[in-house]
UniProtKB/Swiss-Prot annotation:
Cell location: Host cell membrane
GO MF annotations, alphabetized: GTP binding
Location, primary (coarse class): host cell
Keyword Cytoplasm carried by entry: no
Domain notes: The N-terminal domain is composed of the N-myristoyl glycine and of a cluster of positively charged amino acids. It is required for inner plasma membrane targeting of Nef and virion incorporation, and thereby for infectivity.
Source organism (scientific name): Human immunodeficiency virus type 2 subtype A (isolate NIH-Z)
Subunit structure: Homodimer. Interacts with host CD247/TCRZ; this interaction induces down-regulation of cell surface TCR/CD3 complexes.
Mode of membrane association: Lipid-anchor
Family: Belongs to the lentivirus primate group Nef protein family.
Biased composition (Acidic residues): 88-97
Listed name of the protein: Protein Nef
Gene3D superfamilies named in the record: Nef Regulatory Factor
Length: 180
């Protein structure tokens, strides 16, 4: 417990800290105090010394950020090319393409008659579907989602159920689920 200044420091760490502060002073534009070995940053007119390795007020120099080449490109054209290569989820040419998540984020409840009635009453209560902004893109997304959601077979049907093909196809037909 106690403040950080009350703890004893080992000799090797003190030497390391001084070397780091000296190196930091060279890169940040500060200067090392010759007598105490502490770090100083020049403030005009204040005459105060700071012991923190702060680089506030320093200007950005080219090459400071090594792992972010878009910050220091050789040319504006390179910057744009690099950004375009690394934009995984944003493409300007993909406005006409439509997609949706493969798996839902929350488990879907199976649609029952009661849920359908509740949903229709909820929509009517909120004013119906009139006045909603129509978007061709949203319409395609909903069509794809409904197609995907309602063409998936329940687990008890299909070729993985262990039932003979005639039987599981008859069950799908009875439920009104298309099969291919």
């Amino acid at each position: 417990m106690g403040a950080s200044g009350s703890k004893k420091r080992s000799k090797p760490l003190q030497g390391l800290q001084e070397r780091l502060l000296q190196a930091r002073g060279e890169t940040c534009g500060g200067r090392c105090n010759e007598s105490g070995g502490g770090y100083l940053q020049s403030h005009e007119g204040s005459g105060r010394e700071q012991n923190s390795p702060s680089c506030e007020g320093q200007r950005y120099q080219q090459g400071d950020f090594v792992n972010t080449p878009w910050r220091t490109p050789a040319a504006e054209r390179e910057k744009e090319l690099y950004k375009q290569q690394n934009m995984d989820d944003v493409d300007l040419d993909d406005d006409d393409q439509v997609g949706f998540p493969v798996t839902p984020r929350v488990p879907l409840r199976p649609m029952t008659f009661k849920l359908a009635v509740d949903m229709s009453h909820f929509i009517k209560e909120k004013g119906g579907l009139e006045g909603l902004f129509y978007s061709q893109r949203r319409h395609r997304i909903l069509d794809l989602y409904l197609d995907k959601a309602f063409t998936l077979y329940p687990e008890e049907f299909g070729h993985n159920s262990g039932l003979p093909e005639k039987e599981w196809k008859a069950r799908l037909k009875a439920r009104g689920i298309p099969f291919s």
